Amino acid sequence: MADEATRRVVSEIPVLKTNAGPRDRELWVQRLKEEYQSLIRYVENNKNADNDWFRLESNKEGTRWFGKCWYIHDFLKYEFDIEFEIPITYPTTAPEIAVPELDGKTAKMYRGGKICLTDHFKPLWARNVPKFGLAHLMALGLGPWLAVEVPDLIQKGVIQHKEKCNQ
């Protein structure tokens, strides 16, 4: 992990205990409870720090997740849909988050709008199985990716704020 602020944020996210994925039936239900508790705590901490930046929800089985994330740049809010599926080998394998509307707009993305997390995030995830969960994926995966990529895409004129597009 990079800086002290990141360490502090991550230290406030509850770690998970149940090593289970979607194939594990009853244990998966327990893991999902832990995932939700961890996500709720992370969102509450973000709101308390005036750093609210995403919403997530899942299907009934907890295997498909979707929502919105946003990034504030020059006092303008850029909002994006996000989605991911829980891999069958979860938690050993981290989910791959997709930001479909940015598909093909940056080199740090795979087909289908899946963001590239291989160099920095996936080794960290692998060292922390099963303690890391979806809140950690957001805090250490999507959050830093947005912080680097969105300003760059704005500067290059690849994305524009919706209000600027309507003028």
UniProtKB/Swiss-Prot annotation:
One of its GO terms (biological process) is reticulophagy. Ufmylated at Lys-122. Deufmylated by UFSP1. There is a cross-link at residue 122 (Glycyl lysine isopeptide (Lys-Gly) (interchain with G-Cter in UFM1)). The active site is at residue 116. Pfam families: UFC1. InterPro entries: UBQ-conjugating_enzyme/RWD (IPR016135), Ufc1 (IPR014806). GO terms for molecular function: UFM1 conjugating enzyme activity; UFM1 transferase activity. Keywords: Isopeptide bond, Ubl conjugation, Ubl conjugation pathway. E2-like enzyme which specifically catalyzes the second step in ufmylation. Accepts the ubiquitin-like modifier UFM1 from the E1 enzyme UBA5 and forms an intermediate with UFM1 via a thioester linkage. Ufmylation is involved in various processes, such as ribosome recycling, response to DNA damage, interferon response or reticulophagy (also called ER-phagy). Interacts with UBA5 (via C-terminus). Interacts with UFL1. Interacts with UFM1. Interacts with KIRREL3. In absence of UBA5, the active site is solvated by water molecules thereby reducing its nucleophilic activity. A linker region of UBA5 is required to reduce the amount of water molecules in the vicinity of the active site and elevate its nucleophilic activity. Belongs to the ubiquitin-conjugating enzyme family. UFC1 subfamily. This is Ubiquitin-fold modifier-conjugating enzyme 1. It comes from Rattus norvegicus. The gene is Ufc1.
